[in-house]
Amino acid sequence: MKKLFKKKKGVSPHMYMLPEESNSNTATNAPSYSVGGTTANSYSSNSYNDNNNSNSTYGSSNNYGNYGSSNNYGSYGASNTYGSNGSSNNYGNYGATNSNGDAGYSITPIRNDPYARKDMPPMKSSAAVTERPSMHRSAPSQDTLDLKKQELFAGARIQNDDESTTDTIPHNDDGTEGDEYGEGYRDGYEEDQEVEAIKQKIQFVKQDSLSSTRNALLMAGNAEQMGLATLANLGEQTEKIATAEKELDISKIHAKRAEEQARELKTLNRSMFAIHVPKPWGKAKRVAAEEARLAAKRDAERQDEMLNRQFAYRSQKRIDQAMKDNMKSNKKKGDSKGVSILERSHYQFEPDAEDDAMEKEIDGNLDQIGALATRLKGLAYATGQEIDSQNARLGSIHDKSDRLDTDVYLNVERLRHIH
């Protein structure tokens, strides 16, 4: 193989050796790289040729276009293409590809190149390449792009919000904020809130009033029932008082009769030598006086009986009248519908079916409460009169009972002295 090729000046014989015949200790040549669309490679094809050779088998061809250059090597060479946006180095079997983007570059070193120069400084490892300051700027990640988009659109949204806020707030000619729309809108909103608050308050007051009227009606009905029951009890008590007074009058009569018999018994119980002879003169007068006394006694008894009956009758009449008045007032229905319709508008903000029903029920409850109050007044008046009448009769009974007690005590003492 050495005979086929002649050694030329400036060309290393090792560069024409096959890969198998190359020295195993050949160091890795330095990588090729490009910056800004120009080729910067100290060990590229120009270093191995005296002149620019094109289409050589093992030579190199440099074709520079408008935006870069293209180096085409043979089977073991490399091709560097510089386009408008970067470069691409295509090597053969033992080559590497360098891709340059818009900004910076990337380097892929060629290791163990059999055609590299012997006199180039060997590279110990791939770390030597990585130690070089890389000017390649890696492509931004998706998170970085999302952050940048958010920043961009956030600024746009902030600007739009500022513009919309500025547009919605009216300004006067002097640059100050106007009150034609903003304050009018706020005032309208506040008025709506006040109206809603008033409506809710009216509704609450109506419900409270309805509940109060229902409770008052229930309590008034209970009071009426208790008043009627009390009046009925007073009627029964009047009858009992009249009966007690009648029995007291009868007891008084028996006490008077016992007094007479005790006096007669005393006369008959005298000594047997004391002869009792009635006086012969004045007999008619004595008889007339006795009859007058008995008549007066009977008249007093009759008067007491009549007073007792009058007391019972008047008491029953008062009770019956109170009952009749109560029933009559209960059956009477006041027609206040027209007045309620006229006055209802003063208490309604937005009348509807529910509101009308509430107002109607409130009016009805108030009417019933008024009627119940009237009936309760009648019951209270009748009850007061009945209690006063009973108190008077009870006072009379107290006096009669005291006199009867005195008469009974005297009769007992008279009988005790008879022996």
From Swiss-Prot:
Residues 36-60 have a biased composition (Low complexity). Keywords: Coiled coil, Phosphoprotein, Protein transport, Repeat, Transport. InterPro entries: T_SNARE_dom. Residues 21-32 have a biased composition (Polar residues). Signal peptide: none annotated. The modification Phosphoserine is found at residue 141. Residues 1-11 have a biased composition (Basic residues). GO terms for cellular component: plasma membrane; prospore membrane; SNARE complex. Residues 203-265, 356-418 form the t-SNARE coiled-coil homology domain. SUPFAM superfamilies: SNARE fusion complex (SSF58038). GO terms for molecular function: SNAP receptor activity; syntaxin binding. One of its GO terms (biological process) is Golgi to plasma membrane transport. Residues 1-60, 116-143, 156-186 are annotated as: Disordered. The keyword Phosphoprotein applies. Gene3D superfamilies: 1.20.5.110. The keyword Chloroplast does not apply. Has a role in cell separation, a final step of cytokinesis and in the assembly of the forespore membrane. May have a role in the transport of secretory proteins to these growing sites. PANTHER family: SYNAPTOSOMAL ASSOCIATED PROTEIN, SYNAPTOSOMAL-ASSOCIATED PROTEIN 29. Belongs to the SNAP-25 family. This is Protein transport protein sec9. It comes from Schizosaccharomyces pombe (strain 972 / ATCC 24843).
